[in-house]
């Protein structure tokens, strides 16, 4: 899958600089990016095979647990085009305050 935009993941990890869990969060995001980049998902069932704990919000909106569910990553997927768009990343606590179906990148 082609992921747009990796920079969002890097900036989020960088924003945690100085926190003791920052290296673990960065490693988890790098691992997610590598796995999804190699994936060739055709549908949400393919996503669930690789990420059983992922939440399928709609046919195109997926939520991934990052670093043991400490963080949430919301993406939109176009399986036909093989593209995943990063919409939002944050703590589990912040995730509880967003509308996952409507959130857009930069909000």
Question: What is the predicted function of each stretch?
Answer:
Residues 1-70, 78-83, 92-107:
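Basic, Lys/Arg-enriched alpha-helical interface segments
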């Amino acid at each position: 899958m082609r992921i747009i935009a990796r920079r969002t993941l890097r900036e989020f990890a960088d924003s945690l600089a100085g926190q003791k869990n920052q290296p673990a969060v960065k490693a988890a995001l790098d691992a997610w990016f590598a796995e999804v980049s190699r994936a060739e998902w055709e549908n949400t069932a393919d996503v669930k095979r690789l990420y059983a704990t992922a939440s399928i919000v709609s046919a195109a909106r997926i939520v991934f647990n990052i670093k043991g569910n400490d963080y949430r990553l919301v993406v939109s997927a176009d399986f036909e085009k093989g593209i995943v768009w990063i919409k939002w990343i944050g703590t589990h606590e912040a995730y509880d305050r967003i509308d996952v179906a409507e959130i857009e990148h930069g909000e």
